[in-house]
C-alpha cells in the first residue's frame, strides 16, 4: 500500500512505497501531465509526481538532507538555465498558481522542448536569454523572492551575483548548483567549492553548502541570502 505524507518543506511530499522505501514528490499542478517520464501516484484524490534525484540537482539536494529550502508556495523564482523543465516542473508544482517562475534559457532548441509544458503550466514564463547578461531580460522579469541557477559555466558565481543585484529582493535567497569541472578541471572539487564560497560571500550571506553525491559527481549546492 502506497502512502503519501507531507515533507518538512511546504509543497514537497514523501511517498512511502510498498517496500517501505521513501521518495520525494510534488503534487501535480496539472493532473494528467507527465514532464520527463516520471512516475505518478494517485493518493486520496490527488496526483503526485515522483521527483527523481538522478534527474534533478534540486531533488538530489532535498534527498541529501537540505536544511534551507526557500522555494515555497506563492513565491516568485528566477530560474537561470531552465533547460527542458525537469526540475522547473517540480518548482512549478510547489509555487503553485499564486507563484511564478521566470525561466531563462540560452538555447532556442532546448527552450522549444519547454513549450508543450508551459502551455498548461502558466506559472512558468520561458525567456530566451543569456544569464551572463541580466540586463537583456529587464523588461520581462520583476523582482523575485528566489533565484535558482543551474548554469555550467566558469563564471557561475558571478552570474548569480549579477542577477541578484538586478532582480533579487532584499532578504531574498539564491540557490546555485555548482559543477566544479565546469569552473576548473585542473583543481580538486573541494578547492573549487571553497573558491566559489569565498566569491559568493563577498555579496551574499552563505547559509548552506551541500554535496550532491551520489546523484551528481563533483557537484555542490549552495544556499545564499541577499542582505
Curated annotation (Swiss-Prot):
Keywords tagged on the record: Methyltransferase, RNA-binding, rRNA processing, Transferase, tRNA processing
Enzyme class: transferase
Record EC number: 2.1.1.-
PROSITE patterns from the UniProt entry: FIBRILLARIN (PS00566)
Pfam families xrefs: Fibrillarin
UniProt GO BP: box C/D sno(s)RNA 3'-end processing; tRNA processing
Binding annotation for S-adenosyl-L-methionine: 86-87, 105-106, 130-131, 150-153
UniProt-listed InterPro entries: Fibrillarin, Fibrillarin_CS, SAM-dependent_MTases_sf
GO molecular function (one): histone H2AQ104 methyltransferase activity
CDD domains named among the record's database cross-references: AdoMet_MTases (cd02440)
Keyword RNA-binding among record annotations: yes
Database matches in NCBIfam families: PRK04266.1-2 (NF003276), PRK04266.1-3 (NF003277)
Subunit structure: Interacts with nop5. Component of box C/D small ribonucleoprotein (sRNP) particles that contain rpl7ae, FlpA and nop5, plus a guide RNA. These sRNP particles form homodimers, giving rise to an asymmetric holoenzyme.
Protein task: Involved in pre-rRNA and tRNA processing. Utilizes the methyl donor S-adenosyl-L-methionine to catalyze the site-specific 2'-hydroxyl methylation of ribose moieties in rRNA and tRNA. Site specificity is provided by a guide RNA that base pairs with the substrate. Methylation occurs at a characteristic distance from the sequence involved in base pairing with the guide RNA.
Family membership noted in the UniProt record: Belongs to the methyltransferase superfamily. Fibrillarin family.
Protein name in UniProt: Fibrillarin-like rRNA/tRNA 2'-O-methyltransferase
Native species: Pyrococcus furiosus (strain ATCC 43587 / DSM 3638 / JCM 8422 / Vc1)
Gene that encodes it: flpA
Amino acid at each position: 500500500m502506497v502512502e503519501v505524507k507531507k515533507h518538512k518543506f511546504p509543497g514537497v511530499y514523501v511517498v512511502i512505497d510498498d517496500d517501505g522505501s521513501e521518495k520525494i514528490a510534488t503534487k501535480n499542478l496539472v493532473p494528467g501531465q507527465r514532464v520527463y517520464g516520471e512516475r505518478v501516484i494517485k493518493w486520496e484524490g490527488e496526483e503526485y509526481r515522483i521527483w527523481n534525484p538522478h534527474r534533478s540537482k534540486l531533488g538530489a539536494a532535498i534527498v541529501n538532507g537540505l536544511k534551507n529550502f526557500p522555494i515555497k508556495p506563492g513565491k516568485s523564482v528566477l530560474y537561470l538555465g531552465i533547460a527542458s523543465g525537469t526540475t522547473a516542473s517540480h518548482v512549478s508544482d510547489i509555487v503553485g498558481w499564486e507563484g511564478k517562475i521566470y525561466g531563462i534559457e540560452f538555447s532556442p532548441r532546448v527552450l522549444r522542448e519547454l513549450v508543450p509544458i508551459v502551455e498548461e503550466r502558466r506559472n512558468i514564463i520561458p525567456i530566451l536569454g543569456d544569464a551572463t547578461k541580466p540586463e537583456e531580460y529587464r523588461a520581462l522579469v520583476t523582482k523575485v523572492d528566489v533565484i535558482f541557477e543551474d548554469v555550467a559555466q566558469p563564471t557561475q558565481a558571478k552570474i548569480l551575483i549579477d542577477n541578484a543585484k538586478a532582480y533579487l529582493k532584499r532578504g531574498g535567497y539564491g540557490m546555485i548548483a555548482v559543477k566544479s569541472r565546469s569552473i576548473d578541471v585542473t583543481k580538486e572539487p573541494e578547492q573549487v567549492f571553497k573558491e566559489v564560497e569565498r566569491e559568493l560571500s563577498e555579496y551574499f550571506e552563505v547559509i548552506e553548502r551541500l554535496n550532491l553525491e551520489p546523484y551528481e559527481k563533483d557537484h555542490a549546492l549552495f544556499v545564499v541570502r541577499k542582505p
